[in-house]
UniProtKB/Swiss-Prot annotation:
InterPro entries the UniProt entry points to: 7tm6_olfct_rcpt
Note: The atypical heteromeric and topological design of the odorant receptors appears to be an insect-specific solution for odor recognition, making the OR/Orco complex an attractive target for the development of highly selective insect repellents to disrupt olfactory-mediated host-seeking behaviors of insect disease vectors. Odor-evoked OR currents are independent of known G-protein-coupled second messenger pathways.
Record membrane topology: Multi-pass membrane protein
Transmembrane segments: 36-56, 64-84, 129-149, 170-190, 252-272, 275-295, 359-379
Annotated protein name in UniProt: Odorant receptor 33c
Annotated function: Odorant receptor which mediates acceptance or avoidance behavior, depending on its substrates. The odorant receptor repertoire encodes a large collection of odor stimuli that vary widely in identity, intensity, and duration. May form a complex with Orco to form odorant-sensing units, providing sensitive and prolonged odorant signaling and calcium permeability.
Amino acid sequence: MVIIDSLSFYRPFWICMRLLVPTFFKDSSRPVQLYVVLLHILVTLWFPLHLLLHLLLLPSTAEFFKNLTMSLTCVACSLKHVAHLYHLPQIVEIESLIEQLDTFIASEQEHRYYRDHVHCHARRFTRCLYISFGMIYALFLFGVFVQVISGNWELLYPAYFPFDLESNRFLGAVALGYQVFSMLVEGFQGLGNDTYTPLTLCLLAGHVHLWSIRMGQLGYFDDETVVNHQRLLDYIEQHKLLVRFHNLVSRTISEVQLVQLGGCGATLCIIVSYMLFFVGDTISLVYYLVFFGVVCVQLFPSCYFASEVAEELERLPYAIFSSRWYDQSRDHRFDLLIFTQLTLGNRGWIIKAGGLIELNLNAFFATLKMAYSLFAVVVRAKGI
């Protein structure tokens, strides 16, 4: 059998975390601490703030939409990053649970399901995410390169700085460099943010289904009754790990997904409005089209895999009664009956964004409807 290693999918996430918060990994020297503090003050805090402050200066309509598009994206990115930093200890515990659950995959049917569904979906999602991030940052850096070689030192995004950029070319170059650097750091934050939730929900749904396969096969092999009863007790212990897994996931992604749903809906509306009314050059049009796709890629996988988790939890009682429980000992049947009653409560487990919005495909379509409604308001306000 092939060795299962689900944690390999998290390597890019931890690479981002090592770049952004090396102090979490016991690297607590004074220069490293100073690096982390400055990075989060200058980028996580000040970058979205200096974009938002520009909105108070009453810019033109085109500047307002261009600024607001990036402002909302960066505010959401910073908030999600801070939420992930707060939950890093729980994320480490989740990884230890995944590592334990991987060791329980034994039969050919389980390996086949893991290979064809869990591993395939996780790999497809991560590749799609990395390609989309790569495309948008390739276009971003190409646009910066074209701007610099043409001698244009204007800011990438209209923003507030406490000094006059027009009268001092050097300060203008510093401000432009700051925005480019901040966008690259925000890219690492965004990659970490958008990798974790869908990937973890995918693995949770997969391991719940794999447990159902094991449970459904119980009693169909030529084993003694005592052996089957012990296996039932082992599966109950595995179920406890799944319960802990589910609880930790619900807690660690709650705030992140609330920001995701609200931020994506507003950002999609503003991107479409800006493209229709203000984008004139081809590079910007392609950039914002890819940006629109990236925002959708951010939102859809989390909702899709959350729906899969809910469906797998609904099927747990059926998986238990699919086992050959009727040929087992009285103790086996009694334990299974009590256990089934407990799992019926799983059907009420719902992963919610911020404890308010149920996370599933309905939430994804509701967000798109919200974006369309906001866009309709903009169109009506423009008199089109």
